[in-house]
């Protein structure tokens, strides 16, 4: 595992599921972690549970001003930023005939807009760290379309392209950008999993381990994406 002592990370959508598992791993490896989601009470409670190296800052990633405020408060309280994990997501699975304009827009605003707003605000600080990393949590729905996925697939396909284009933009500024694309994960989030995988999904900590693997690579190496799917049914 990487030694993250002295590093500072923001993890969005980190009060439960994949985001919480990532935050726990980061803290365990020595990082200071900003736990973030839309609900102030939840982020404070989760941060307290994670211990003295975690703080909670609420943020609606669909709001550009809130994203700027999240980064500014992180720098004010922790002094630096080394890792940004864009995990917050929205998934509304409906055929296009039933999907409303508002439901379409929230998926675009959170799954694409939030990544753009927060990454843009964080980039100067990530570059200043000398070894910054943006890790976007995507989905296999970003390469495998399915019925009912008009909005969700569009946002996740777009996130793959955004990740790779962003990396080309910032690779000479001491920042790497990668995406982790899991299949079905055993969490409360219900967007975009294929039925064939739902009977034996990945665990949230599998995704957290993938984050640790990316952070363990030397800065001279870049893994653009990690695709994850269950290799076998659970035992027992």
Explain the meaning of each model-derived region:
Residues 8, 15-16:
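Conserved glycine-rich cofactor-binding loop
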Residues 139:
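Residue(s) in the substrate-gating loop at a strand-loop-helix junction
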Residues 119, 155:
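Active-site helix of classical SDR
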Residues 29-45:
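Conserved glycine-rich Rossmann-like NAD(P)H-binding loop of the short-chain dehydrogenase/reductase
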Residues 95-96, 103-105:
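Substrate-binding pocket helix/loop in short-chain dehydrogenase/reductase
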Residues 172-175, 179-180, 187, 196-236:
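C-terminal helical subdomain
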Residues 40, 59-70, 101:
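The beta1-alpha1 cofactor-binding region of Rossmann-like NAD(H)/NADP(H)-dependent oxidoreductases
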